[in-house]
Amino acid sequence: MKVESLKTSPDRAGRYWVTFDDGSKMGLYRQTVEDFALYSGKELDEQEAEALRTAAGQMSAKMRAVRIVSAASVSRRDLEARLVRKGENPQQAKEAVAWMEDMHLVDDRATAEQVVSSCISKGYGLMRAKQALYEKRIPKEYWDEALADYPDQTEKITAFLKSRLDADSDEKQVRRAVDALIRRGHSYGTIRRALNALSFDTEDFQEEF
């Protein structure tokens, strides 16, 4: 396989595009170009070509992993799944995640703490926080520690109810407010106590609460 042309400037993703004599193209990062000492006219035997394809895939997975982690807090499992969904080779995705861990760029314990902190700041209940940890694929071994100091949400629930309801609110409006709080992960018991504190009649909600 022969290098027919090599772009001298990278694209927006930082890749240098190489065109080969068989018409195929590869977007390579600078390190890969330098590691293989590529230049226009260079001949690669089959072993070298295969090594280049492997190296290109590994570097692609690593760089994509860096971009994902830079944009959002992710767990090890979540990162690996995202890489595969984006088209990276499963084995190379696994290796990229291991590389990220070695670089201390992925930490499930720290991610769990960040997820829980975000839920608290948004006024979400404990169940919503657990759902968020599950969706982020955080291993359960980190859940208890991250959730240990989850604050009581009664004040936030009360403030929410006050913003939605008043003395003239009917049962339909109350139910709508309750449903909104349930979606935010608050328990029926805590919501009922807040309603009682605000002097709303919860007798009709007994079976649901």
Q: What residue ranges belong to the model's regions?
A:
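An alpha-helical, amphipathic repeat domain used for nucleic-acid recognition
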Residues: 1-209
